[in-house]
C-alpha cells in the first residue's frame, strides 16, 4: 500500500510477538528493506494504557518480542511505536492479560490510542 507518497508493506507475523523477529528478518531480506526503514508497532505493558511512545532506536526493555526482533535483525537501530496497554491488574497473569479480549470499559480508550498511533505512523513514514 501507500502512505502519502511512500510505498509501505504491513507485516503481521503469524507467530506470537515473542517470536516475531524471524519473520521480520525474512521479510526485510526478501524485500531488501534496510533496518532503519522498518517500523515496528507493538503493545507494551510497561506503558500506561492509552499512551503512545515513539523511539528512533533503543533497547527492548522488558519486551520479549522486541528482544526477538533485535536479535534477528542484529541491531537496535530501527524505529518503533509503542502502544500502552498497562499496567496489568494486580494478581493477574501477565500472559493471559496481554492475550485477553479488551474489556468493554477500555475499548474507547484503545480506539483513541490506535488513532494516535496511526497519526504518528503517517507522520513517521511521511518524514522518512
Which positions does each model-derived feature cover?
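Hydrophobic alpha-helical segments within soluble ligand-binding/sensing domains
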Residues: 62-65
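Nucleotide and nucleotide-moiety/phosphate-recognizing core
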Residues: 1-57, 67, 71, 75-81, ...
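Active-site oxyanion-binding pockets that recognize sulfate/phosphate
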Residues: 103-107
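Short glycine-enriched, charge-decorated loop/helix-capping segments at active-site entrances
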Residues: 53-59, 97-102
Amino acid at each position: 500500500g501507500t502512505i502519502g507518497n511512500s510505498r509501505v508493506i504491513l507485516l503481521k507475523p503469524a507467530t506470537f510477538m515473542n517470536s516475531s523477529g524471524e519473520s521480520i528478518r525474512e521479510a526485510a531480506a526478501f524485500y531488501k528493506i534496510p533496518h532503519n526503514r522498518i517500523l515496528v508497532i507493538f503493545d507494551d505493558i510497561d506503558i500506561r494504557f492509552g499512551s503512545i511512545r515513539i523511539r528512533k532506536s533503543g533497547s527492548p526493555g522488558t519486551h520479549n518480542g522486541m528482544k526477538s526482533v533485535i536479535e534477528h535483525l542484529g541491531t537496535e537501530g530501527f524505529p518503533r511505536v509503542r502502544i500502552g496497554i498497562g499496567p496489568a491488574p494486580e494478581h493477574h497473569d501477565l500472559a493471559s492479560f496481554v492475550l485477553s479480549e479488551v474489556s468493554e470499559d477500555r475499548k474507547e480508550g484503545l480506539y483513541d490510542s490506535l488513532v494516535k498511533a496511526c497519526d504518528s505512523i503517517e507522520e513517521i513514514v511521511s518524514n522518512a
